[in-house]
Amino acid sequence: MIFLYWHSPNRAIFERSFFVEDASAETVIRAVSRWCVLDECGRIVPAAKVPHKETVLSEERAFTDQDWKIGEEIPLWEKPIYSMTVACSEYDLNMHMNNIKYADCVFNCFSVKELSARVLSGFSLHFLRQSHEGDRLDFYRHALSDSVYQVVGKCGEVPVVSARVEFCRAQTE
């Protein structure tokens, strides 16, 4: 079952939380969507000036900052593990790199052998900035423990995406 909960907008940011529950009402997927509205000059339109339907807000089910924030800093000694240049095939209708393409890049930071040997137990992705055609993105992977990794994608020195990848155990045959 899929549940959608709206958050109360602050002055500029709109948010929705999504939950997918299995048959035993256990949450198996959680996601949050955050966005703002820009005018034709690229300025943020205050939330109070954006027409929208009245919705039932469910703050008790909404994500907290701790649920979605992932660090953006990677130790200075880390070298890029994967790099790519954004091309037209990564674009979406909004004329920037499609969000799901970032997930592909994060998993390109692991070898097939590494992924085959483990079971994925958690994946969090935080989009920080848009990427456009011609941008060179460098992805850095840092082990936080034996089973938890942080991946940060940067355009130059600017982080554009941050991810947390968690494994629960070794894959059994």
Please tell me what each predicted stretch does:
Residues I2-Y5, M95:
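Short secondary-structure boundary segments
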